[in-house]
Amino acid sequence: MKSGAEAHLVVDKIINYEKYPVTNANFYSNALNCAYFQESSTNGYAERRFAQTSEDVYDYISNNTTINVTRAYYTGSNVDPTNWNNGLYSAGEPLPSYLLKPTFPWDGNATQIINEINNGVFYVLHRDHGFENGWGDPYFDKTHIDNLTNGSLLPVVFSINCLTGKFLEDECFSEKFLRKADG
C-alpha cells in the first residue's frame, strides 16, 4: 500500500469480510476457473500444464463438493486441443471428450470473467502466464477490474502465474484487486 488511506481500505475490507460474511448461499456455491491451453505447433498437445492444472482443481471440486465451477478456458482459434502436455508433469493423455472442440468453446474472455465475478463466485482461479498488469489468457488486466460491481461478494483469487503480485511496481494487478473500494 502506498498510503494510509489505501491500507485503511484494505484492512476495512478484511474486517468486513470476517465480521459480515456473505449470507447469500449462492455465493458459496459458485466458482470460476480460468486457464490457457498453450499450443503453438498446432499438433493438439498442450505445451504447458495451465489448463490441465485448472481442470484437476475443477475435477476435485466437482467430485467432492456441491460447488458449481464455471470454466473460462482460452486457446487460439487455430488450435484444436486434443491432448494434455507430454512433458515433465504429464504424459500427454487425451483431453476428456467434453473439453474437445466444438463441444467446448475454448473462448474464455474478460467479459465472461467480469460477469461471473459480478454475479458472485466464492473463488476465482487463474492459471496461465501473468504480468504486472494482469493475466495473459483469457486476457484480463487492471482496466477490467474497474468494471467489477460485485460489492461485498469478494472472491478468493488464486492468481497462479508470474508477476501479478509484483508489489514493487506502481500498482500491480493483485494490488488493484485489493484496493478496489466496491468489489
Predicted feature locations:
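Cysteine-dependent hydrolase recognition
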Residues: 1-183
